């Protein structure tokens, strides 16, 4: 007979290892390429020493002259706060009792919940990789009334998400958290539940965030690929090596454009690109370019079951969350997802995973991970934007 105790045991012993492996390697092709480590985590912070420049103690001299003066490496310390990543499943008491005498039915129930958790995680963690940590899903493009909101883009939305409307500075407008009930991808609009918005409630320029995520998401590519401001506690104005290579208004994507960026990184930063990610429209434009010149399109198989185009042995992967008209050329060896620990179930003082929701006949279990993404060498990465899509 299935009991709460046996359900807890199943989540701990049978599901945790499998779901952790899938979350780490099958959520996103870029995430699968990034190493994960518990090193450099101190309390609630990541403190990592970053080396830049070269050692100064080298030189040539005469047979009897002075040896080169010793000059060590240059170091700075990156500091950032661990982000709190959660994934929650919910099972009703009725469903638990209905499957109490049928182990197979209960396994199917848990499998279905886990599958839903994986799909939601793949969507949200994949989205965060390209964000700037602010949690902004989209900006409101026009004043909106009723329950439909016009956005500048809806690629970060999915039916079922719980979102809120904020000012451009991240201040909650007090309109409550709303569940997305429809996503109009043709017209860049979303529909949410709850009370209809009135005039002046939602104005152009407002931002839409995931519940609880304002300035709480990981430091994604959107934060790394900037030329001003601070990152990891250091100023880009002072430390130019924190600024990646960024070329705008590219237009048509060609092998020459890609190679120029790769050569620049190699010559100026000693960085070797090993992973290229772009939007689907950019990938199609590159495929069209290859077809125009009768070039063969080579396909590579990546870890996690992903397939990619090949450019001189470098995988080119399209990602739904990559900004339109954009291609990133990365050395993933410079990236690390620093974490306090791998995915774990949130346990109560009694060691139980499944907990009853107060006042409701439902039980929840929550996966947690405390981590953030650090790029040790931002100047060794490149971004091409303004690419004409197909």
Q: What residue spans do the PLM features occupy?
A:
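Core alpha/beta structural scaffold of self-assembling particle/tube/pore-forming proteins
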Residues: 1-57, 71-390
């Amino acid at each position: 007979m299935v009991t709460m105790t046996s359900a807890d045991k199943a989540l701990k012993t049978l599901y945790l290892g499998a779901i952790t492996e899938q979350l780490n390697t099958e959520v996103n092709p870029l995430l699968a390429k990034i190493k994960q480590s518990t090193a450099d985590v101190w309390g609630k912070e990541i403190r990592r020493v970053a080396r830049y420049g070269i050692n100064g103690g080298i030189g040539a001299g005469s047979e009897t002259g002075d040896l080169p003066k010793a000059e060590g490496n240059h170091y700075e310390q990156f500091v950032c706060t661990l982000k709190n990543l959660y994934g929650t499943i919910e099972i009703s008491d009725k469903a638990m009792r209905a499957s109490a005498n049928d182990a197979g039915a209960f396994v199917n129930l848990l499998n279905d919940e886990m599958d839903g958790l994986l799909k939601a995680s793949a969507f949200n963690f994949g989205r965060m990789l390209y964000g700037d940590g602010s949690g902004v899903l989209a900006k409101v493009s026009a004043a909106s009334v009723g329950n439909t909101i016009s956005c500048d883009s809806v690629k970060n939305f999915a039916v079922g998400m719980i979102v809120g409307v904020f000012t451009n500075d991240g201040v909650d407008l007090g309109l409550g958290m709303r569940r997305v009930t429809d996503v109009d991808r043709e017209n860049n609009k979303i529909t949410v539940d709850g009370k209809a918005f009135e005039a002046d409630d939602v104005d152009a320029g407002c931002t839409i965030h995931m519940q609880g995520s304002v300035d709480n998401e990981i430091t994604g590519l959107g934060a790394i690929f900037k030329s001003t401001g601070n990152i990891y506690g250091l100023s880009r104005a002072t430390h130019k090596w924190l600024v990646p290579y960024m070329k705008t208004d590219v237009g048509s994507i060609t092998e020459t454009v890609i190679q120029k960026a790769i050569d620049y990184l190699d010559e100026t930063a000693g960085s070797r690109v090993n992973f290229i990610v772009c939007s689907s429209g950019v990938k199609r434009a590159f495929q069209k370019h290859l077809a125009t010149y009768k070039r063969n399109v080579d396909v590579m198989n990546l870890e996690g079951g992903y397939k990619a185009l090949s450019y001189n042995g470098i995988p080119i992967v399209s990602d739904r969350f990559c900004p339109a008209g954009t291609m990133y050329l990365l050395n993933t060896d410079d990236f690390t997802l620093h974490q306090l620990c791998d995915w774990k179930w949130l346990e109560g003082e009694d060691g139980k995973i499944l907990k009853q929701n107060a006042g409701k006949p439902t039980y929840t279990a929550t996966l947690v991970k405390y981590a953030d993404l650090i790029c040790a060498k931002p100047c060794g990465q490149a971004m091409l934007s303004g690419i004409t899509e197909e």
